[in-house]
Amino acid sequence: MATGRAHRPATRSRGIPEATVARLPLYLRALTALSERSVPTVSSEELAAAAGVNSAKLRKDFSYLGSYGTRGVGYDVEYLVYQISRELGLTQDWPVVIVGIGNLGAALANYGGFASRGFRVAALIDADPGMAGKPVAGIPVQHTDELEKIIQDDGVSIGVIATPAGAAQQVCDRLVAAGVTSILNFAPTVLNVPEGVDVRKVDLSIELQILAFHEQRKAGEEAAADGAAPPVAARKQQRSTGSADQGPDGDVPAVMPA
């Protein structure tokens, strides 16, 4: 099987927007689930619902791939799986190195979804000499001194950084110098890379903060709604007491002449 060095996905040269590229894995996941259930075709509405997007956006995205489906029939599931996999570069082997084998790095190493999507964990690397040689997910951990040699020997172009923030930039620099051109960064820091190197950042704490913002907003909306709509019993009491205090025109209390 060819390695990652032999190919670059054609999405940039074909002018596919980055937003569309970001949604292709969502479509592929939904299509793979349909394929596993032996579903032969799917409508744009059904696939859009499964992927969590609207059908108009899905049809626009697929137009960049040259796939328009068949009126009254829908999309061929198996063909779309192949087409999207090819566009994402998943029809071949992509060797990956994971640097930083702490709790997060070990969890990534044990993730079973990499191999089925075309990513082979070529090496696990850590700066702790005590980790060297210890197996994680059946792969022996290697010391960072071996980083450059591993990248060159295995033809690695994708690196995953799961180190503490303070070590991430130095690891990034070494990866890039050794020939890595795509980095998935789990370290809570921003990496500086030269032009031509792609970085995707995954910060779980930021995602949780965004969720906290939405939770706070929902709580505020609920509190505002509760304050704007008094209970039914309170409204009835207001009406009954108010009628005794109002004058004949309903605006001021009635005053009897002396």
UniProtKB/Swiss-Prot annotation:
Tagged with keyword Transcription: yes
One GO molecular-function entry: DNA-binding transcription factor activity
Region entry Disordered, spans: 219-258
UniProt subcellular location: Cytoplasm
Skewed-composition ranges (Low complexity): 225-234
Record-linked Gene3D superfamilies: NAD(P)-binding Rossmann-like Domain, Winged helix-like DNA-binding domain superfamily/Winged helix DNA-binding domain
GO biological process: negative regulation of DNA-templated transcription; response to redox state
DNA-binding region, residue intervals: 26-65
Effect of residue 102 to A: Loss of redox sensing
Residues annotated to bind NAD(+): 100-105
Keywords for this protein: Cytoplasm, DNA-binding, NAD, Repressor, Transcription, Transcription regulation
UniProt family annotation: Belongs to the transcriptional regulatory Rex family.
Subunit structure: Homodimer.
Function recorded in the entry: Modulates transcription of respiratory genes in response to changes in cellular NADH/NAD(+) redox state. Binds to the DNA sequence motif 5'-TGTGAACGCGTTCACA-3' in the promoter of the cydABCD operon. May play a general role as a sensor of cellular redox balance.
Protein name, UniProt field: Redox-sensing transcriptional repressor Rex
Source organism of the structure: Streptomyces coelicolor (strain ATCC BAA-471 / A3(2) / M145)
Gene: rex
